Amino acid sequence: MDLKDEFIQIIKKYSELSLKESENETKKYIQEVFNVSLSEVFIKEPSKQETLKQEPTQETNGCIYIFKKGKNIGQKCGSGKSKFCYKHKKNDLNIKVNQERNIKKPIPKPIPTNKIETGSVINQNWFIGTSIGKGGFGEIYSAAKFNDHGNYKDDDFSFAIKIEPKSNGPLFVEMHFYKRVIVEKEIEKFKLQKNIQYLGLPKYYGSGLYNDYRYIVMEKYDSNIDKLFRNGDLNSSTILQIGIQILNIVEYIHSKGYIHADIKGENILLKENDTSHIYLVDFGLCSRYSNIYQPDPKKAHNGTLKYTSRDSHQGVESRRGDLEILGYNMIEWSGGILPWQHLCKKSAGKKILNEVSESKIKYMNDLSLFFNKVQFNDTNLKNKLQTYFETIIKITFEELPPYQLLHNIFN
């Protein structure tokens, strides 16, 4: 896909949102999509005298110029061959981008050990407690909230604060996902429509910048499904119960136009090992859903390799892909060994990535072979999961998944 086609696809996905937001929010949307810093994004209202031959006043390589309600703006503008504008007819939104935006930026450095110390105070709101988890770039701490009098309760570290370098993209994406999707009013409306009492999405308490770091604050949990699995604490009934809850969550996320793309045991949290109320977290790989199937090599193989969907291996995020990822997890929780599992190493190169992708394609094209290869202790659970996979592999890319039918299979 050349730059123009990619550009048009992205603008079609984002233009409706962009015009509903303030200028700063529009900049953030574009920053998220094109992976540039906010200083590289400019929004201006072109005057009636502006023509295609005139350059915007800002002259910076790798910039994106956004024109709202512009006139005389065509699909190519400026003197540079790699520069062009695209006008989205529905919302009259015009954006200009330089091909030089594809210059690779340095990978942000992880937070050094003990850089954020216990006892630190973030923006006069949050008191940092002990570290409760560490990832590739950031760290998660317990936290207490200051009240209006500047005090906090010593025994109330019921919050979790996730901190990463502010140049790291996933936490930026996650922060905006929380703001746009985890909205209590919308969640309550969905629960009412679906006649369910509970939807496993974490409570969001705020986010912001702290020195050279970005942070997000959410509810703190006690454990995750991966730990229960490794301890042998997942039986067939519990696995099906978790599957039903995840189906509810992804249906809601999909209804808001997003794909999760990284469902796995480590990202499914719970309190006091209560599997009747699980919470799906980590939205750093979330992306907006597009009904155009357009593989993107830059996004190919995103996610956790063992569970990545066939679409994700091609650089396309899809609703059916989330369901496929869930199915792979449920097989593993059931004690099954995925046929490509031995290939999934932390430092997998391109050859291994392609081998895993090809293995999934092979087995999804022959489910009988797949389920003969995977070992199950529970025949009833195996039959349910086989029916589940037989259903989801028939879903076309653009098709809305039959969530209720999948519920019925697990019930």
Swiss-Prot record:
Residues 126-410 form the Protein kinase domain. ATP binds at residues 132-140, 162. The active site is at 262 (proton acceptor). The keyword ATP-binding applies. This is Probable serine/threonine-protein kinase 389L. InterPro entries: CK1_Ser-Thr_kinase, Kinase-like_dom_sf, Prot_kinase_dom, Protein_kinase_ATP_BS, Ser/Thr_kinase_AS. Keywords: ATP-binding, Kinase, Nucleotide-binding, Serine/threonine-protein kinase, Transferase. Its EC number is 2.7.11.1. It comes from the Viruses. It catalyses: L-seryl-[protein] + ATP = O-phospho-L-seryl-[protein] + ADP + H(+); L-threonyl-[protein] + ATP = O-phospho-L-threonyl-[protein] + ADP + H(+). Belongs to the protein kinase superfamily. Ser/Thr protein kinase family. GO terms for molecular function: ATP binding; protein serine kinase activity; protein serine/threonine kinase activity. It comes from Invertebrate iridescent virus 6 (IIV-6). It holds the Pfam family Pkinase.
